[in-house]
């Protein structure tokens, strides 16, 4: 199946996949813009296609320590509990994997990364999530790992970044918010409206580029 790709690192470029990076950055560093003057909103990136027809997305977790694996499973479960028409399921050996999560240590500034693959119609086909065990030469706490996993799963569900600091979908790890709030949920619903709102069997790409929080 032919795949389309795009790259996203704060700015969206035309290419092969969309890559979202979650970075560590102190709020005092110059160049980090505050968004107080704008409406609070979350970018909408993309839409799942036929894969979501049954309302189930499968995942696998590889190269993870037992404790880290449980944190990622808890992150999937937390999203699962907040989305009525969608369920995450850990794939067995015979199932197609929609979302692959892997761990590594590069001691860089990227704490998490999501790579989204598209089919020829522009729908999400599969995702790969990379989670760092160390960043800035420091081991990440369990709280941070779970937060980053929840953030990356937000990208998996079609979200981009939020334009305000106290959001799970903020592009920077500044003020850790482990909570999935109503704005996150509504944005995911809009990204995948054909299934999660309309309950249709015919996938339709979202026309919304962002969701303004109410």
Question: Which residues make up each language-model segment?
Answer:
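Disordered inhibitory propeptide/activation segment of secreted metzincin zinc metalloprotease zymogens
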Residues: 5-68, 76, 113-121, 196-201, ...
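Metalloprotease/metallohydrolase-associated module, dominated by Zn2+-dependent proteases
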Residues: 18-27, 119-121, 125-144, 160-214
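Intrinsic-disorder/low-complexity, polar/charged segments
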Residues: 65, 91-93, 185
């Amino acid at each position: 199946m032919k795949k389309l790709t795009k790259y996203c690192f704060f700015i969206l470029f035309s290419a092969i996949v969309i890559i979202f990076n979650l970075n560590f950055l102190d709020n005092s560093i110059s160049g980090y813009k505050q968004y107080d003057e704008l409406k609070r909103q979350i970018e909408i990136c993309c839409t799942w296609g036929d894969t979501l027809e049954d309302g189930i997305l499968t995942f696998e977790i590889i190269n993870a320590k037992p404790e880290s694996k449980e944190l990622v499973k808890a992150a999937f479960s937390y999203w699962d509990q907040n989305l009525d028409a969608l369920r995450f399921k850990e794939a067995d050996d015979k199932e197609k994997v929609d979302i692959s999560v892997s761990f590594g240590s590069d001691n860089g500034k990227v704490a998490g990364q999501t790579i989204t693959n598209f089919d020829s119609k522009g729908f999400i086909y599969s995702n790969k999530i990379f989670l760092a065990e160390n960043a800035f030469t420091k081991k990440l706490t369990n709280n941070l790992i779970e937060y980053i996993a929840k953030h990356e799963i937000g990208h998996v569900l079609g979200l981009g970044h939020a334009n305000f600091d106290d959001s799970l979908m903020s592009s920077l790890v500044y003020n850790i918010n482990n909570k999935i709030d109503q704005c996150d949920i509504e944005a995911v619903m809009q990204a995948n409206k054909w299934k999660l709102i309309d309950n249709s069997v015919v996938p339709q790409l979202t026309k919304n580029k962002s969701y303004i929080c109410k």
